[in-house]
C-alpha cells in the first residue's frame, strides 16, 4: 500500500469505540447459540478418554491455538494440529479416543473438509465451529456450534474481527463450562502453571526453600551473647536459634532483641544468650505452603521464622527466601 496522508481531524478514539460497539452487539447475539448443541459438545469433551484436538486455518488457526491452550490449562487435555500438516502425516496423532474441534468461519475450509472423511473412518467425534449452519463442515459435524455474526468490525467486511472474537468467546465458554463440571480448582490450575506466580503460591512449600543443615544459625543456651552475635553474623539471617544438642528449640534471638539489649544499657560482654533470648518463639511446619508462612510473618511483623516439627528444629525461613522464590 502506498503512503497516504492522515486525514485532518481523524478520530482514532471514535474508530476504536465503533469496533467495540460492533463486537459487543455480536457477542450479545452469541447467547442464542449456547443451546443444546453446546451441551452436546461439552458432554463429548467431558467424556473424552483421549485429548481434544483443535484445528483451524489462518486466523481461525490462531484462535484454535489459544483455545487448545485454554482447554489444556483448565483440565481438558488438548493440543492444536495445523490442517495442512495433518494432511501430511500429523493426523496420525489423532486417535478414536480423541475429539476434534474444527474451526472455520465460512465452514468451507478445503484443508479441513479434506480431512473429514478420514476422521469419519476413524470414528473420531467431530465438533465444528462455523458462522454458517448450512456449510459443508456444519453438515458433516457430529455437533455444530454456530458463531454467526451480523457484521465484521472491519469497515470493508474483510478482516476477521467480530467473527474471530465470537469464536474465541465460544471457546472460552466451552473451557469454563468444563472447568466447572470437573470441579477444577486453583490448585489444579497451579499444577499446569508451576512457573507462574499462582503456581509458586499454590505449590511451593516451606521445606522447598528453607535453610537447613549448616545454614541454620543456632547456638547452645550456655553460649555467650558475643558468640551468639557471631553466629547471627556468619549465617546472615538476622537471628539465631537457641537449642540443645538434639536440636530441640529453647528460644530465639533476633536483631530486634539485640536493639532492646542495647537500650537496657547493660554490659553486653557479661551476658549469656540465656539472659536475653526469647523463650520458645514462633515456628511453622515444613509442609505448609510458603505463602502461608509469608502471611504469618507479615501478620507478626517478623522477617524470619523457625521451621520445626514440634520443638525439633528443622530449618529457618527468611523473608528474602520468599522474595527469591517469587512468593512475595
From Swiss-Prot:
List the catalytic activities from the record: D-arabinose 5-phosphate = D-ribulose 5-phosphate
Q: Give the quaternary structure.
A: Homotetramer.
**Entries under Pfam families matching the protein:** CBS, SIS
Which molecular function term from Gene Ontology is one that the record holds?
arabinose-5-phosphate isomerase activity
Which segments constitute the CBS domain?
A: 210-268, 277-328
The main enzyme category here is isomerase
Please indicate which residues carry the site annotation Catalytically relevant.
59, 111, 152, 193
List of residues binding Zn(2+): 82
GO terms (BP aspect): lipopolysaccharide biosynthetic process
Q: Which gene encodes it?
A: kdsD
Keyword terms: Carbohydrate metabolism, CBS domain, Isomerase, Lipopolysaccharide biosynthesis, Metal-binding, Repeat, Zinc
The task this protein performs is described as:
Involved in the biosynthesis of 3-deoxy-D-manno-octulosonate (KDO), a unique 8-carbon sugar component of lipopolysaccharides (LPSs). Catalyzes the reversible aldol-ketol isomerization between D-ribulose 5-phosphate (Ru5P) and D-arabinose 5-phosphate (A5P).
Q: Which family does it belong to?
A: Belongs to the SIS family. GutQ/KpsF subfamily.
Q: Which residues bind substrate?
A: 75-76, 82, 88, 114-123, 148-150, 222, 275
Q: What is this protein called?
A: Arabinose 5-phosphate isomerase KdsD
Q: Which residue spans traverse the membrane?
A: none
Stretches assigned to the SIS domain: 42-184
Name the pathway it acts in: Carbohydrate biosynthesis; 3-deoxy-D-manno-octulosonate biosynthesis; 3-deoxy-D-manno-octulosonate from D-ribulose 5-phosphate: step 1/3; Bacterial outer membrane biogenesis; lipopolysaccharide biosynthesis
**EC number per UniProt:** 5.3.1.13
Q: Which organism is it from?
A: Shigella flexneri
Amino acid at each position: 500500500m502506498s503512503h497516504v496522508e492522515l486525514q485532518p481531524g481523524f478520530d482514532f478514539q471514535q474508530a476504536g469505540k465503533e469496533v467495540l460497539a460492533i463486537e459487543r452487539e455480536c457477542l450479545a447475539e452469541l447467547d442464542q447459540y449456547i443451546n443444546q448443541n453446546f451441551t452436546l459438545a461439552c458432554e463429548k469433551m467431558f467424556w473424552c478418554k483421549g485429548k481434544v484436538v483443535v484445528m483451524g486455518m489462518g486466523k481461525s488457526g490462531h484462535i484454535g491455538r489459544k483455545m487448545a491452550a485454554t482447554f489444556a490449562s483448565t483440565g481438558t487435555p488438548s493440543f492444536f494440529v495445523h490442517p495442512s500438516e495433518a494432511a501430511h502425516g500429523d493426523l496420525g496423532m489423532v486417535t478414536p479416543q480423541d475429539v476434534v474441534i474444527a474451526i472455520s468461519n465460512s465452514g468451507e475450509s478445503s484443508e479441513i473438509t479434506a480431512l473429514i472423511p478420514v476422521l469419519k473412518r476413524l470414528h473420531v467425534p467431530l465438533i465444528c465451529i462455523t458462522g454458517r449452519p448450512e456449510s459443508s463442515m456444519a453438515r458433516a459435524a457430529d455437533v455444530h456450534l454456530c458463531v454467526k455474526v451480523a457484521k465484521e468490525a472491519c469497515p470493508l467486511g474483510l478482516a476477521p474481527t467480530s467473527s474471530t472474537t465470537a469464536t474465541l468467546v465460544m471457546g472460552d465458554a466451552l473451557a469454563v463450562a468444563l472447568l466447572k463440571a470437573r470441579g477444577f480448582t486453583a490448585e489444579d490450575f497451579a499444577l499446569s502453571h508451576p512457573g507462574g506466580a499462582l503456581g509458586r503460591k499454590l505449590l511451593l512449600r516451606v521445606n522447598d526453600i528453607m535453610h537447613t543443615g549448616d545454614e541454620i544459625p543456632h547456638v547452645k543456651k550456655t553460649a555467650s551473647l558475643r558468640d551468639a552475635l557471631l553466629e547471627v553474623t556468619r549465617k546472615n539471617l538476622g537471628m539465631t536459634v537457641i537449642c540443645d544438642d538434639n536440636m530441640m528449640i529453647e528460644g530465639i534471638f533476633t536483631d530486634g532483641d539485640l536493639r532492646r539489649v542495647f537500650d537496657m544499657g547493660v554490659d553486653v560482654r557479661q551476658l549469656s544468650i540465656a539472659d536475653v533470648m526469647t523463650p520458645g518463639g514462633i515456628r511453622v511446619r515444613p509442609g505448609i505452603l510458603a505463602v502461608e508462612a509469608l502471611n504469618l510473618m507479615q501478620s507478626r511483623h517478623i522477617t524470619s521464622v523457625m521451621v520445626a516439627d514440634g520443638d525439633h528444629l528443622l530449618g529457618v525461613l527468611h523473608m528474602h527466601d520468599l522474595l527469591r522464590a517469587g512468593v512475595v
